[in-house]
A protein has these predicted regions:
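Membrane-helix boundary/coupling elements in multi-pass transport proteins
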Residues: 93-109, 222-226, 295-338, 391-400, ...
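Membrane-interface "cap" regions at the ends of multi-pass membrane proteins
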Residues: 1-43, 47, 52-61, 69, ...
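Helix-loop-helix junctions that connect adjacent transmembrane segments
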Residues: 5-8, 43, 123, 127-130, ...
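Hydrophobic transmembrane alpha-helices that form the core helical bundles
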Residues: 55-62, 66, 70-136, 145, ...
Length: 480
């Protein structure tokens, strides 16, 4: 290897940090803590990482190594291993999953803005839901308008705000552990951390919440293009992924322990209203309390909220634009999409595609106008995203199984495991875990939330089948 080639290679440790900032976030800690009865989530985190995340990450490494020249991600992998039709469905799923994600970004923006301005949870929650949802819908339309201009003016701001939020998440853990020594007279929760107290109650609520953890640890396929840029990929990549897993496990456990000194699970689960409030506000309360421990008032919370304001708006715009381009710009799958959706405006943007995003995401936003309470809306969106977003991971595991079926014809510099049976078992295992968690996650005691969790993925799936039929009808008519 020449000196120039060595200079362009990245170390396994650099890869681990790149992947960590992509996969992990402070919201994963707070959601796990709230949904899994505080410190009891530690048990679930450990098993989720050992039996799901590590094999998932290593399978992605093998896929990235085998298709190092393919830039289309999962859709390209399936096109190479199966056929164009399945590649289309993978691309469609990736785009469709973002419909619910886009619907949640406007609410996240308003919540962050409210905390930055009013510095409390009560003001936002006191507004009538229909007004909040109307404002959220207007933010969606604003995001669609900016995306239709072909501009990504907030991309650099997103990077800066995302980095700031990421750094603050790590600082939170360090500063929270140091707080008792600095401010010993402050009020801290004394959590029971005995082994027996950490074993969760395996009931319906537990199993229907597992999709939250699957959603939290997913997304590492985004780093697959870097597999062959790592020094000695066959050894460097798995080392980087194992390091990533250790970092994420450590962050999840230490973050949970830090939060257990602040929040009492009994208070969180005291009522449905209390639970909804913690789902919507726990991250802001965490930084607000941290500021009180260090005698700086609401400073940490305001910084976190302002970073979130920028991030939520920027992610909204990028989530409208990027998945749509991945779906409609793929030459291999254009034949399955009606020509009307390929319409490009003067800025090179698929204008009709953006209109479809506005209609579908807007429908979810407006449907939630009838939900009693803004905090309940955010809880619904958190659960809905945990049901829909992991569905795109199913195609990763399908692509991996297809790759192993073509073991002799598609070479890869890095292999997760050499044994075919073991490799296919893990591919099938991760596929099954994802599918089961998504289906179980649909259940909710609230009938409206349950209906939303079922109807949304069903409608998006049906629409994914309808488009190829419309495209085929167009092509048949054009031949006559």
């Amino acid at each position: 290897m020449s000196n120039k080639e060595k200079a362009t290679k990245i170390s396994w440790l650099t890869l681990a940090f790149m992947a960590f900032s992509t996969v992990w976030g402070f919201g994963n800690i707070t959601n796990g803590f709230v949904y899994f009865n505080g410190p009891q989530v530690i048990f679930s985190w450990i098993f989720m990482f050992a039996l799901y995340f590590i094999p998932y990450a290593l399978m992605v490494g093998e896929l990235g190594s085998a298709f190092k020249n393919e830039g289309g991600g999962v859709s390209s992998w399936l096109h190479q291993t199966t056929n164009a039709k399945l590649a289309y469905y993978a691309g469609w799923t990736y785009w469709a999953c973002h419909i619910t994600y886009i619907a949640s970004k406007g609410s996240g923006f308003l919540k962050a803005l409210s905390w930055a301005v009013f510095r409390n949870a009560e003001t936002y929650d006191s507004f009538p839901t229909r007004y909040i949802q109307l404002a959220t819908f207007c933010i969606l339309l604003l995001g669609c308008y900016i995306a239709s201009l072909g501009l990504n003016p907030l991309k650099k701001l997103l990077t800066a705000a995302g980095t700031c939020t990421f750094v603050m998440s790590l600082l939170y853990i360090l500063m929270m552990f140091a707080a008792p020594a600095i401010t010993p007279t402050a009020e801290y929760v004394h959590a029971n951390l005995s082994f027996s107290s950490l074993i969760p109650n395996f009931n319906v609520t537990y199993f229907t919440s597992l999709s939250i953890l699957v959603f939290a640890v997913g997304g590492c396929e985004k780093i697959s293009p870097y597999v062959n840029k790592v020094e000695n990929p066959s050894k460097g990549f798995p080392r980087g992924m194992i390091t990533l897993a250790v970092m994420v496990v450590a962050c999840a456990i230490l973050g949970t322990l830090a939060m257990s000194r602040m929040f009492d699970p009994a208070v969180i689960n005291a009522s449905a209203e209390s639970f909804n409030a913690y789902v919507a506000n726990s991250s802001y309360w965490a930084f607000q309390k941290l500021g009180q421990y260090y005698h700086v008032g609401d400073l940490f919370m305001i910084i976190y909220a302002l970073c979130n304001v920028i991030s939520q708006l920027a992610v909204l715009i990028l989530s409208i634009d990027a998945p749509l381009r991945m779906l409609l710009d793929n030459e291999h799958t254009k034949q399955f999409i009606p020509q009307a959706l390929h319409k490009v405006n003067a800025h090179g943007v698929h204008s009709n595609g953006i209109k479809m995003v506005a209609v579908l995401s807007g429908s979810i936003i407006l449907a939630q106008s009838f939900v009693p309470g803004a905090a309940a809306v955010l809880r619904q969106l958190t659960k809905l995203n945990s049901v829909c977003m992991p569905m795109r991971y199913l195609w990763v595991f399908a692509a991996y199984i297809a790759l192993r079926n073509a073991y002799d014809t598609i070479p890869a510099e890095y292999r997760f495991v050499k044994n075919q049976a073991v490799a296919k078992f893990f591919g099938g295992w991760c596929f099954a875990v994802t599918a089961v968690c998504c289906v179980l996650g649909m259940y909710d005691k609230d009938p409206f939330t349950f209906a939303l969790n079922v109807i949304t993925p069903v409608v998006l799936t049906v629409l994914g089948f309808i488009l190829p039929a419309l495209a085929k009808r167009e092509q048949t008519a054009a031949k006559k």
